[in-house]
């Protein structure tokens, strides 16, 4: 088998175009992990978020490692009413957390 590989996690905030369209989607990209099982948890400030979360099934990349993504759908009001949002990825017992914060100006 191949060695375990920890995922690299990137968290993207909603785009300004999206906010102008009265939508807000956070995207958490998880890539280069092996084996292909991850758990994704979202948090607003420090409270868990369950609603509006959609996580894809990990798919195998060309390098035989896995990639997945998780989406959190919010309203712009929800997005702006918290200090930060976090995407927590747990893989093989270790957790990677990435956080984005809404900027005041948009």
Curated annotation (Swiss-Prot):
GO terms for biological process: immunoglobulin mediated immune response. Residues 7-101 form the Ig-like domain. Coiled coil: none annotated. The keyword Cell cycle does not apply. InterPro entries: Ig-like_dom, Ig-like_dom_sf, Ig-like_fold, Ig/MHC_CS, Ig_C1-set, MHC/Immunoglobulin. Displays the following serological isotype: Mcg-, Kern- and Oz-. The Mcg- isotype marker is characterized by Ala-6, Ser-8 and Thr-57; the Ke- marker by Ser-46 and the Oz- marker by Arg-83. One of its GO terms (cellular component) is extracellular region. One of its GO terms (molecular function) is antigen binding. Immunoglobulins are composed of two identical heavy chains and two identical light chains; disulfide-linked. Keywords: Adaptive immunity, Bence-Jones protein, Cell membrane, Disulfide bond, Immunity, Immunoglobulin, Immunoglobulin domain, Membrane, Secreted. The keyword Repeat does not apply. Its main location: secreted. The gene is IGLC2. It holds the Pfam family C1-set. This is Immunoglobulin lambda constant 2. PANTHER family: IG-LIKE DOMAIN-CONTAINING PROTEIN, MHC CLASS II-RELATED. Disulfide bonds join 28-87. Constant region of immunoglobulin light chains. Immunoglobulins, also known as antibodies, are membrane-bound or secreted glycoproteins produced by B lymphocytes. In the recognition phase of humoral immunity, the membrane-bound immunoglobulins serve as receptors which, upon binding of a specific antigen, trigger the clonal expansion and differentiation of B lymphocytes into immunoglobulins-secreting plasma cells. Secreted immunoglobulins mediate the effector phase of humoral immunity, which results in the elimination of bound antigens. It is found in: Secreted; Cell membrane.
């Amino acid at each position: 088998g191949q060695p375990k590989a920890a995922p690299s996690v990137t968290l993207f905030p909603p785009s300004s175009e999206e906010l102008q369209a009265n939508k807000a989607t956070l995207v958490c990209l998880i890539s280069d992990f092996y084996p292909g099982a991850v758990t994704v948890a979202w948090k607003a400030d420090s409270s868990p978020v369950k609603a509006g979360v959609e996580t894809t099934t990990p798919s195998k990349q060309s390098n035989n490692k896995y990639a997945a993504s998780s989406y959190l759908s919010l309203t712009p009001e929800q997005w702006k009413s918290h200090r930060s949002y976090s995407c927590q990825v747990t893989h093989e017992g270790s957790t990677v957390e990435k956080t984005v914060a809404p900027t005041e100006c948009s």
